[in-house]
UniProtKB/Swiss-Prot annotation:
Single GO biological process annotation from the record: purine ribonucleoside salvage
Catalytic activity: IMP + diphosphate = hypoxanthine + 5-phospho-alpha-D-ribose 1-diphosphate; GMP + diphosphate = guanine + 5-phospho-alpha-D-ribose 1-diphosphate; XMP + diphosphate = xanthine + 5-phospho-alpha-D-ribose 1-diphosphate
Superkingdom: Eukaryota
The protein's name: Hypoxanthine-guanine-xanthine phosphoribosyltransferase
Binding site for GMP: 77, 144-152, 176, 204
Keywords, comma-separated and alphabetical: Cytoplasm, Glycosyltransferase, Magnesium, Metal-binding, Nucleotide-binding, Purine salvage, Transferase
Length: 231
């Protein structure tokens, strides 16, 4: 697989782990914080499964980039957990691979993006970032938590064009099977999940549930409890 450079096309991408519509686990089978439990329906993807899948994604990414230096953009705040775990595995695989190297594999950058209030897209994208002009002529991998409608990544990739980046690829932990999806595909995907609003593993509902270890479904009571007062 060559280094991807057609954002949204998902050319030559490996298949994600498919989570069926009726898959999931009883909350009582896992350690769930008491202050969250009543607001959740079920565990969709357990923490251990998420971690192992991220390790495999790191392995796939390393195979594609080999020893080419690339820069990783973390889209905060939802991608924080995925990003941190991915970097840990990428570093270990690179540092202890059979091929000796005298340089680090990647640089890391952080971009704050926001496009949701409650469980709905606001239709606008707020971007706060460091100076990204250093990315000119570089390979860039965008790390996103979830592709829902795909609108966020379309707008963000458009925003990046002014920096004259050499290649742009996308890694996301989850892609949601929703009729609202615009067809934007990632190059590295962890899981394909049903059309439900998910929280946990840094995914939030109005900044709540980020510290939940597992990927879970939030129920209507939870949405009502933590609903923002205005869009």
């Amino acid at each position: 697989m060559p280094i991807p450079n057609n954002p949204g096309a998902g050319e030559n991408a490996f298949d994600p782990v498919f989570v069926n519509d009726d898959d999931g686990y009883d909350l009582d089978s896992f350690m769930i914080p008491a202050h969250y439990k009543k607001y959740l329906t079920k565990v969709l993807v357990p923490n251990g499964v998420i971690k192992n899948r991220i390790e495999k994604l790191a392995y796939d990414i390393k195979k594609v980039y080999n020893n080419e230096e690339f820069h990783i953009l973390c889209l905060l705040k939802g991608s924080r957990g995925f990003f941190t775990a991915l970097l840990k595995h990428l570093s270990r695989i690179h540092n202890y691979s059979a091929v000796e190297t005298s340089k680090p594999l990647f640089g890391e950058h952080y971009v704050r993006v926001k496009s949701y209030c409650n469980d709905q897209s606001t239709g606008t994208l707020e971007i706060v970032s460091e100076d990204l002009s250093c990315l000119k002529g570089k390979h860039v991998l965008i790390v996103e938590d979830i592709i829902d409608t795909g609108k966020t990544l379309v707008k963000f990739c458009e925003y990046l064009k002014k920096f004259e980046i050499k290649t742009v690829a996308i890694a996301c932990l989850f892609i949601k099977r929703t009729p609202l999806w615009n067809g934007f595909k990632a190059d590295f995907v962890g899981f394909s999940i049903p059309d439900h609003f998910v929280v946990g593993y840094s995914l939030d509902y109005n900044e709540i549930f980020r510290d939940l270890d597992h990927c879970c479904l939030v129920n209507d009571e939870g949405k009502k409890k933590y609903k923002a007062t205005s869009l």
